[in-house]
């Protein structure tokens, strides 16, 4: 059977969404929204969307046949059957108001993802950190095993050149978003929880117990014959395990993990470890990603694959050949500067735990390099809520260039901006950070800061990623152009 025939067979098994033909995405340039839109385009739906700025996601969707408008306007939704929105979109958005007036159904991103998953074998990956990498690793293992899954990932899977793809099998592998509790819409066959920390607490009324209970509810969306794959190394996950009334498979470095990593070592970008599973021979593996946190992500993929009886050879090959994900400890190259060669790495992590894991991976893989971090805080509320944690973790680098907060649409909060954070780090006494008032000014500072052999790490979830790529394309020539607008 050809791939086209297999896809046709799959389509015949999955009911279409009744009369829905034309689907419009408000904020289509986001990775999650754009990924779902790409799958729907390839399923044959007429997809349109809008965002405040053009980016790689909108460009790709245009090439696939989606109709993209830059800017939000009521006329964009005049001829559509349903409007899909993310929580980043203000309810006063003109397209939302127009859809309400026209009585067009408005659904959240996770509701549309749930529809895609409804008639498939869903694998949903949740957790405060590591979702994108874990989802990418699972998709890669399943692809290596010939399972040809559909996947929707929150970052660019480098080997596929996209963050979403429509496969020909019954499998759908996707990130599950806890930031707005919308992951409760999903009803997968397998759920993964990587870890649980206090983040997006405005969604949960500042109540950490409510957040933990919501993760338990997410796992209880599994059928009674489904499988919950959880990281036993995480203290909060371990705490809620007695409340989970589903089959559990645990993973981690802990001795009581069902899927356990042993003999960990790291050299440069690669990690080596042995995985021990109940009833199976030990497996020696090479992971083409740095850091113990990524070994945990790989263990989740191994646990899911083992439960689905995927051959160890596919696991082994997928991990050693893994090409990474965009903006997840992404090596952008080595560049000559007047003072010597500098290595440039870009990372999306924007929570203190994520930043700490990135620093640890950099220290382990390149212990002789001076670590220079250009960090852009993301959201005033996160900076306020985790302020002391940020002060502590950012003090661990050798040189810190601290940009102002990327607001992501939030109003400024006094005492939770880049200048305040810079002062607090300086008062701690471990290093003297340099405040960068505008991303454009970073290039002006770098020549005086960088030394031969440095590892320059650009870190954060805002437009610092665009700046990092601009530095790479100019070989750290520091000819910085205008950065993209903050996307909706």
From Swiss-Prot:
Q: Which GO BP annotation is one of this protein's? A: cell wall organization
Q: Under which EC number(s) is this enzyme classified?
A: 6.3.2.8
Recorded catalytic activity of this chain's protein: UDP-N-acetyl-alpha-D-muramate + L-alanine + ATP = UDP-N-acetyl-alpha-D-muramoyl-L-alanine + ADP + phosphate + H(+)
Pathway note: Cell wall biogenesis; peptidoglycan biosynthesis
InterPro entries the UniProt entry points to: Mur-like_cat_sf, Mur_ligase_C, Mur_ligase_C_dom_sf, Mur_ligase_cen, Mur_ligase_N, MurCDEF_pg_biosynth, UDP-N-AcMur_Ala_ligase_MurC
Grouped into one coarse class, the protein's main location is cytoplasm
| Localization per Swiss-Prot or TrEMBL | Cytoplasm
Signal peptide as annotated in the record: none
Q: Which Pfam families match?
A: Mur_ligase, Mur_ligase_C, Mur_ligase_M
**Keyword field:** ATP-binding, Cell cycle, Cell division, Cell shape, Cell wall biogenesis/degradation, Cytoplasm, Ligase, Nucleotide-binding, Peptidoglycan synthesis
GO CC annotations, alphabetized: cytoplasm
List of residues binding ATP: 127-133
Q: Which GO terms describe its molecular function?
A: ATP binding; UDP-N-acetylmuramate-L-alanine ligase activity
UniProt family annotation = Belongs to the MurCDEF family.
Q: What does this protein do?
A: Cell wall formation.
For this protein, the record's PANTHER family field holds: UDP-N-ACETYLMURAMATE--L-ALANINE LIGASE, UDP-N-ACETYLMURAMATE--L-ALANINE LIGASE-RELATED
Q: What is this protein called?
A: UDP-N-acetylmuramate--L-alanine ligase
């Amino acid at each position: 059977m050809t791939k086209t025939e297999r896809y046709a067979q799959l389509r015949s098994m999955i009911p279409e969404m009744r009369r829905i033909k034309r689907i419009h995405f408000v904020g289509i340039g986001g990775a999650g929204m754009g990924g779902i839109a790409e799958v729907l385009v390839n399923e044959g739906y007429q997809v349109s969307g809008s965002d405040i700025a053009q980016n790689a996601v909108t460009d790709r969707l245009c090439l696939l046949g989606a109709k993209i408008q830059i800017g939000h306007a009521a006329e964009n939704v005049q001829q559509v059957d349903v409007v899909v929105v993310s929580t980043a979109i203000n309810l006063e958005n003109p397209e939302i108001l127009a859809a309400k007036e026209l009585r067009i159904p408005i659904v959240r991103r996770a509701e549309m993802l749930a529809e895609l998953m409804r008639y498939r074998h869903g694998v949903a990956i949740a957790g405060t950190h590591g979702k994108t990498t874990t989802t990418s690793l699972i998709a890669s293992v399943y692809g290596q095993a010939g399972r040809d899954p559909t996947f929707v990932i929150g970052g660019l899977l480098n080997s596929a050149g996209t963050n979403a793809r429509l496969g020909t099998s019954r499998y759908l592998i996707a990130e599950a978003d806890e930031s707005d509790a919308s992951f409760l819409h999903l009803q997968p066959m397998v759920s993964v929880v990587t870890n649980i920390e206090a983040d997006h607490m405005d969604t949960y009324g500042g109540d950490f117990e409510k957040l933990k209970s919501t993760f338990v509810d997410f796992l209880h969306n599994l059928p009674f014959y489904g499988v919950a794959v959880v990281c036993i190394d995480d203290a909060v996950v371990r705490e809620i395990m007695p409340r989970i009334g589903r089959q559990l498979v645990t993973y981690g470095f802990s001795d009581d993990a069902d899927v356990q990593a042993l003999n960990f070592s790291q050299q440069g970008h690669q990690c080596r470890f042995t995985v021990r599973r109940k009833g199976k021979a030990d497996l020696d593996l090479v992971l083409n990603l740095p850091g113990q946190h990524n070994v945990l992500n790989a263990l989740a993929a191994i646990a899911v694959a083992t439960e689905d009886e995927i051959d160890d050879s596919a696991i082994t090959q997928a991990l050693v050949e893994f090409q990474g994900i965009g903006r997840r400890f992404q090596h952008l190259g080595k560049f000559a500067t007047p003072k010597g060669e500098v290595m440039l790495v870009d990372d999306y992590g924007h929570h203190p735990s994520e930043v700490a894991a990135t620093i640890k991976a950099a220290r382990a893989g390149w212990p002789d390099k001076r670590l220079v971090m250009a960090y852009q805080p993301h959201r005033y509320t996160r900076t306020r809520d985790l302020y002391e944690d940020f002060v502590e973790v950012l003090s661990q680098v050798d040189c810190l260039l601290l940009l102002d907060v990327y607001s992501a649409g939030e109003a400024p909060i006094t005492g939770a901006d880049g200048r305040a954070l810079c002062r607090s780090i300086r008062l701690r006494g471990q290093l003297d950070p340099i405040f960068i008032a505008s991303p454009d000014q970073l290039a002006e500072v770098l020549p005086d800061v960088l030394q031969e052999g440095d590892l320059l790490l650009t870190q954060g979830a805002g437009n610092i990623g665009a700046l990092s790529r601009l530095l790479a394309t100019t070989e750290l020539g520091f000819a910085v152009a205008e950065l993209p607008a903050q996307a909706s």
